[in-house]
UniProtKB/Swiss-Prot annotation:
<feature type="binding site">
    <location>
        <position position="19"/>
    </location>
    <ligand>
        <name>UTP</name>
    </ligand>
</feature>
<feature type="domain" description="Glutamine amidotransferase type-1">
    <location>
        <begin position="306"/>
        <end position="539"/>
    </location>
</feature>
<comment type="pathway">
    <text>Pyrimidine metabolism; CTP biosynthesis via de novo pathway; CTP from UDP: step 2/2.</text>
</comment>
<dbReference type="InterPro" id="IPR017926">
    <property type="entry name" value="GATASE"/>
</dbReference>
<keyword id="KW-0547">Nucleotide-binding</keyword>
<keyword id="KW-0315">Glutamine amidotransferase</keyword>
<feature type="binding site">
    <location>
        <begin position="194"/>
        <end position="199"/>
    </location>
    <ligand>
        <name>CTP</name>
    </ligand>
</feature>
<dbReference type="Pfam" id="PF06418">
    <property type="entry name" value="CTP_synth_N"/>
</dbReference>
<feature type="binding site">
    <location>
        <position position="77"/>
    </location>
    <ligand>
        <name>Mg(2+)</name>
    </ligand>
</feature>
<keyword id="KW-0479">Metal-binding</keyword>
<keyword id="KW-0067">ATP-binding</keyword>
<dbReference type="GO" id="GO:0004359">
    <property type="term" value="F:glutaminase activity"/>
</dbReference>
<comment type="subunit">
    <text>Homotetramer.</text>
</comment>
<feature type="active site">
    <location>
        <position position="514"/>
    </location>
</feature>
<feature type="binding site">
    <location>
        <begin position="154"/>
        <end position="156"/>
    </location>
    <ligand>
        <name>CTP</name>
    </ligand>
</feature>
<dbReference type="GO" id="GO:0044210">
    <property type="term" value="P:'de novo' CTP biosynthetic process"/>
</dbReference>
<feature type="active site">
    <location>
        <position position="512"/>
    </location>
</feature>
Length: 540
């Protein structure tokens, strides 16, 4: 294919001055506005780190690992993209420097470069450009928004910036747009906005051969027209192409703020795209109004091992918020360090909360504290939601304290346990090495809470796990007619959902429902959990 025959338009988003400016939220917000106007939009994240993917990175380093339907372990920004766009990303939506270099080195070993010296230019840059084309074709996109990780000036980003510089020539001027986000500091003492960091950031970007057509200025105060004109003159940018990204209390306000400033009109004009509908953002306006006028509060205890960095549970936090908004209540999460939970303090730690959630995790650290929390929820009729490891530990807790299987455990924790109620997955997947990754079907059992919540026969949910409930113990667990395996993957005979008949709301799942929750379409399990927690609050 001749690159100039490609019909897709590309928006490249870079960041300057400091990291964590909200490039991902900017990308997701623009994506939602353009989708709303009738365009088919996909978003891609280019990460300059050498890791192949974040799958083996510490949650303290990187936050959560977001899993796509096709089993890719990706950057948490893809969660923002999916939640804002309500579109599924794919493994093509997250590209790392590690993937690029690995691919090029493999091709060199296979002799595909015909003995040439393999260099950053052209081989690495061509590989990056091919990834841009791949995501456009795979998603059949009218517009691909590409976020470049890191900050302009980082040495790791150099090949990516060079590649996106080249695509303007390769794809055509009106098919490419460069958007640069910068910080505009406000000095409270002097009551003055400082533009110098933005000037230097744009200067550095231009030195690399990239002239941004749009600036998005992150600021805690509104930026007056005089300041915008000053930045426009010194950065050689149309004043009409300078937009504010003011600090907001609700992330989704960014969609309305950028649309109100006309960023979508400017983008469509640049791409010479006409005959697209006006944006109808009424549903987002209603959501924001609802959030601003919440009348109740629900308090959830999250008992985890990575609680120092809340981003390790970002999608769970967002899914709980989505469900809470539906019930007109503000979410308050109490972060409980599972390592500090003991039999002596468990009651004082958890007695005041409306619901208890035990999320995922790997390894044996903090396991016993989570099991204590599950036992407390079960024996005190407090709504309980277990996710991934949370389900495995619910199985262990029940085995020990109800079935009296002394020493019951997971093979991940104790390879010599006499009762391995949690074992390694029986059927290996080709995706992600030793992990079961991606979306799989789950058949729901009739006359169960799970079936009532989903109101479907078959559901599809995303997975990321290495261990699971041992199917050889299922009959023993279900013998007393209380413990129910209510969701099963029939193809591989895997236990996906467990629940208790005698408990008001005790459900644990092997998969990650948080990855499918959307602000305008909360996940049914999270809705059910929040509803049960509110009922528990009422009955106290």
């Amino acid at each position: 294919m001749n690159n100039k025959d490609l019909k897709t338009k590309f928006i490249f988003i870079t960041g300057g001055v400091v990291s964590s400016l909200g490039k991902g939220i900017t990308a997701a917000s623009i994506g939602q506005i353009l989708k709303n106007r009738g365009l088919k939009v996909s978003i891609q994240k280019l990460d300059p780190y050498i890791n192949i993917d974040p799958g083996t990175m510490s949650p303290y380093q990187h936050g959560e690992v977001f899993v796509t339907d096709d089993g890719a372990e990706t950057d948490l920004d893809l969660g923002h993209y999916e939640r804002f766009l309500d579109e599924n990303m794919s493994k093509k939506s997250n590209v790392t420097a590690g993937q690029i270099y690995q691919s090029v080195i493999n091709k060199e070993r296979e002799g595909k470069y015909l003995g040439k010296t393999v260099q950053v230019i052209p081989h690495i840059t061509e590989e990056i450009k091919q990834k841009l084309i791949d995501v456009a074709l795979f998603h059949k996109s009218d517009v691909v928004i590409v976020e470049i990780g890191g900050t302009v000036g980082d040495i790791e980003s150099s090949p990516f910036l060079e590649a996106i510089r080249q695509v303007r020539f390769d794809f055509g001027y009106h098919n490419v747009l460069y958007l640069h986000t910068t910080l505009v500091p406000y000095l409270k003492k002097a009551q003055e906005i400082k533009t110098k960091p933005t000037q230097h950031s744009v200067k550095e970007l231009r030195a690399l051969g990239i002239q941004p057509q749009i600036l998005v200025l992150r600021s805690e105060v509104p930026i007056n027209p005089e300041t915008k004109n000053k930045i426009a003159a010194l950065c050689d940018i149309n004043p009409q192409a300078i937009f504010e990204a003011l600090d907001v209390d609700i992330l989704y306000q960014m969609i309305l703020n950028l649309h109100h400033q006309g960023i979508d009109d400017f983008i469509l004009q640049h791409f010479k795209l006409t005959n697209f509908s006006n944006a109808d953002l009424q549903s987002w306006k209603q959501l924001i109004t609802r959030i601003q006028n919440l009348e109740k509060k629900v308090v959830i205890a999250l008992v985890g091992k990575y609680i120092v960095l809340h981003d390790a549970y970002l999608s769970i936090i967002e899914a709980l918020k989505h469900a809470s908004y539906q019930y007109n209540c503000k979410l308050e999460i109490k972060w409980i360090d599972a390592e500090k939970v003991t039999p002596d303090n468990i009651s004082s730690l958890l007695e005041d909360y409306d619901g208890i959630l035990v999320p995922y995790g790997f390894g044996n650290r903090a396991i016993e504290g989570k099991i204590l929390a599950i036992n407390y929820a079960r024996t005190n009729n407090i709504p309980f939601f277990g996710i991934c490891l949370g389900m495995q530990l619910a199985v262990i807790e029940y085995a020990r304290n109800v079935l009296h299987l002394q020493g019951a455990n997971s093979l991940e924790v104790d390879e010599k346990t006499p009762h391995p109620v949690i074992t390694k997955k029986i059927v290996d997947s080709n995706l992600g090495g030793t992990l079961r990754l991606g979306s799989y079907p789950c058949h729901l059992k009739a006359n169960t809470k799970s079936k009532a919540i989903y109101n479907q026969e078959i559901i599809y949910e995303r997975h990321r796990h290495r261990f699971e409930m041992n199917p050889h113990y299922v009959a023993l667990f279900e013998k007393n007619n209380d413990f129910v395996v209510s969701g099963i993957n029939q193809e591989q005979k895997l236990c996906e959902i467990v629940e208790l008949k005698s408990h008001p709301w005790f459900i644990a799942v092997q998969f990650h429902p948080e990855f499918l929750s959307r602000p305008l379409k909360p996940h049914p399990l999270f809705k059910g959990f929040v509803e049960a927690s509110l009922l528990n609050q009422k009955n106290k």
